[in-house]
């Protein structure tokens, strides 16, 4: 018996596990907000220590990336992400987790073809599309005369 796509979708909806959507959204919001709150606390601490605003922002990002890498290495970030969903994936910590996870997973294949190459299967598209988006945005601003040459 061949099943159509609509029949399959109906069967999945009927038999698949149902998650509490509002609770999942609220939890993702709280986790993402908590990560951002931690970032703001770190930034305020850097500013209170007399560090310039721009450098404080850079140090905050680096601190969150390092913390995410450590938590990923210990296996704790995956547990958080399993429950928090996009709340833990959208901030910069989610990107760091994705890169470090790939590096850990393919470590046995060697440093170059394992860790080095597989890290960028995740990071590569983000870097490419991020750079492309920045170039397009810069071109639009330049064409509008908002960006000095």
Predicted features by range, described:
Residues 25-30, 58-62:
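Hydrophobic alpha-helical transmembrane segments
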Residues 9-24, 109-118:
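Cytosolic juxtamembrane amphipathic/interface segments immediately preceding
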Residues 31-41, 64-72, 134-138:
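Hydrophobic core segments of alpha-helical transmembrane domains in multi-pass membrane transport
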Residues 76-111:
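Mid-chain, well-packed structural core segment of small domains
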Residues 1-9:
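Short, charged cytosolic
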Residues 49-68:
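Loop-to-helix transition at the N-terminal end of transmembrane alpha-helices
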């Amino acid at each position: 018996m061949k099943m159509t796509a609509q029949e399959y979708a109906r069967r999945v909806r009927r038999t698949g596990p149902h998650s509490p959507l509002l609770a999942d959204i609220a939890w993702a919001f709280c986790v993402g907000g908590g990560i951002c709150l931690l970032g703001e606390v770190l930034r305020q601490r850097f500013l209170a220590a007399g560090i310039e605003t721009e450098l404080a922002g850079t140090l905050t990002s680096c601190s969150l990336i390092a913390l995410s890498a450590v938590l990923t290495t210990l296996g704790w970030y995956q547990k958080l992400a399993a429950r928090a969903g996009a709340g833990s994936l959208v901030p910069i910590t989610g990107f760091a987790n994705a890169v470090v996870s790939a590096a850990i997973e393919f470590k046995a294949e060697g440093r170059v073809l394992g860790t080095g190459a597989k890290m960028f299967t995740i990071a590569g598209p983000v870097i490419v599309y991020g750079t492309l988006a920045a170039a397009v945005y810069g071109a639009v601003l330049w064409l509008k005369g908002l960006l000095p040459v």
